[in-house]
Amino acid sequence: MQENNINDLVASASRVIAPLWPIFTFAAHHPWMGLEKQSFEQVANWLKEARNVDIYPSASMIHSAKAKGEIEESFLQMSLSRWLDSQSFHIPREKAERFCQAALKLEKLPSSLLSSPEVNKLAEEMNYINTASMQASVMQPISSLIESQNSENLSDVLNYHIIKWCKLYLDESGSNWTMPNREKGFYRAWQHLITFDPALSKNERKVLKNWPQDAEVALARALSELGISESNIQSYLEGHLLSLPGWAGMIRWRSQQSIQEQELLIEYLAVRISMELAIVKPYLPLKNQKVEKKVSIVPLIASWIYWGNISTREWLQMPAAEQSELLAFAYRFDENIRRKLWLEAWEQTHAEQLREKIASTQRATNDKKRVLAQLAFCIDVRSEPFRRHLEKLGPFETFGIAGFFGLPIATSELGSNNNHPSLPVILKPKHQIKELTNENELKSYEQRKRVGSSVRYTFKTMKQNVMTSMALPELSGPLLGLQMVTRSFVPRGVGGFIRKLRKTMLQKPDTTFSLNHVHDTKGEIPIGFTKEEKVNYVRQALKIVGLTEKFAPLVVMCGHSSQSTNNPYAAALECGACGGAAGGFNARVFATLCNLPEVREALFAEGIKIPKDTIFAAAEHKTTVDELEWIYVPELSETAQEAFDCIESIMPNVSQHANRERLTQLPNFKTKIKNASKEAHRFAEDWSEIRPEWGLARNASFIIGQRELTQDCDLEGRAFLHNYDWKQDESGDILANIIAGPGTVAQWINLQYYASTVAPHYYGSGNKTTQTVTAGLGVMQGNASDLLPGLPWQSVMQSDSETYHSPLRLLIVIQAPSQYIERLLNNDFTFREKVQNGWVRLASVDPKGHWKNW
């Protein structure tokens, strides 16, 4: 096999896994992003066959949703009728409907019926029935087909070894003992050590002795010796990637970060399949490496007896052709189809409830009060309740925009030598922005910073050193024990004290930004912006939300951040549009750009007239405690000062209302809360708290339109809200950019929550309380599990038996005439594919308020 061919096959196979970002820069991703050319239904069926993974909501989730009024029976009947209309069958429609109605109750077939001698005898007598068309062939890793003498599946043995080697190579925690020859790449480092691995038997090490030094050659040789034909190689590689999707996803992400590691996924598969050969060689050759999943007709007959109300006597009296038709129909109307129809009914119910809510609260666009301040928030669903309460309590107008404010920047905070790409992970930064201050202030700040850093560094060094780690528990035990007790039993007081101490010690001096373009910089990313770029980014963001006239005296750009303690998933609660970081930096940079005279003059020449007394400021919305923290307030005009004072005066009430609404949704908060803000701070500071906030759980829709469309709507913190005025977008470019950027981020977030809810054992990350942070990369259950790719149980579940997140595919609602939607679908093939294949849902609201499902 040629090397180019194996490279192409690995690239094609990689579609079955998604890149996995390190947990401390957590970026939402949906696990099927490489499979969107297939329909959601096709992927669901394939995963069920290949990995026995269900990606439709379970029967218990569906029954619970129906009991809560989240699913209307009429929509289920409509879905069933559509499905029956799409099928070709030769049994009476009434009989088929009766069978389907009974099966849709999602009851399990009684085990007594399945094991009944009478039913099994019927099945034996029907051996003439041809079930070949019902069978599915799945290419499984050979190791998964073999059990050792200890009754241990060899795929588990293989996974144990691969996890060990992945941890060694990928370790980012700064271990003192690193993997030898790591700089030569994963495969070469593994090859250097594998023949000394005591965990392998002598015969297994012998197989790998003198193994090829080149990863591509080794992979091709291993596949050849395993007897995998060229036509089955891609399917075989996919099976191996799906065996440990977390570690494979991390490998794939790393391969995309640098040229030096671009072949890392090939190296991973070379290591994995070479080790598989060594482990399974004593059992070769196998008679049949392709697993034929034979269809048992026992449950098909039992389903007609139980749901079709057919007796065994009636079955025996049927002609063979009729029996075949009934079996084929029962096979087609399988559990996946039944749950698919329920999911569609659930989604249609949600869409209808949202339509009614929007229609009942729409107000005339000319019914406007005097606006004292305008505040732009991230589209994040957690902004919706905060915006709603803010608008109710004061003369304010709010906007929704992606929380990076359209700035493709990498941020470098004061005193830091590193930068963070503060934009959606689907984009690459084009500018580096540094936080600056004068030299004396910088030295003083860095000295204070070094004190804390040196303590942490000393502790880490002692922990990782063989000798000092023995003494560390005795030395640090009393202090850490005291910290554990105080942070668990008096979290708010201790947390507040630590925050004040940190603020005093690490109080930043007044800072500016490197906004002006620096020529001939050594880094890959240029520092600052040219004048044209400054104007372009400001114009673009103002136009995208429709804020090009009627500016209020104070315009506040609000990034957002979360606040939690002892939480490995802290980055998952930060701003997704800022790559898993707080959005305050971007908000401050954007507000600063808007205040520059050169920017305002250029915008004025283009017809965007920002009044002289309009001032842009920046703040950060703390989502865990629903507070607004000011991070940039320049000198204010008289009217802007009035607006600022008004915001300050009502903010405690806004926080109380928003916190009360949010906290009552948490488990164990059914009683009345006396002081919601204090309770929220306790959750944020308690390091034993496994659920400081719900994050983006229950997200279900992405609404693109003017604020009037949803103003006064209680959207329950379930909607991403992005401002959009179609009247200012004749070309449709603004809408296309919203769909391609924020729309994609929202879809990824939505499907990550979906996957973590419906398949928590495979796409989630299990129970937070039993997780281990591993190699500075992510979490595992214990020390020998997959690198867990999704969200923890506590992010999507109310209890062990009740979900909190409703697993619905994202509904994108666009306020625009139908021709805008048609143009978008015609021009954007990727988005059209997502809609057609069921990865997102799409609806529109035209200028007359008419709702249309696409």
Swiss-Prot record:
GO terms of molecular function: zinc ion binding
Name of the gene: dabA
GO cellular component: plasma membrane
Name of the protein this chain belongs to: Probable inorganic carbon transporter subunit DabA
Alphabetical keyword list: Cell membrane, Membrane, Metal-binding, Transport, Zinc
Location(s) in or outside the cell: Cell membrane
Organism of this sequence: Bacillus cereus (strain ATCC 14579 / DSM 31 / CCUG 7414 / JCM 2152 / NBRC 15305 / NCIMB 9373 / NCTC 2599 / NRRL B-3711)
Matching InterPro entries: DabA
Binding residue positions for Zn(2+): C378, D380, H560, C575
Family note: Belongs to the inorganic carbon transporter (TC 9.A.2) DabA family.
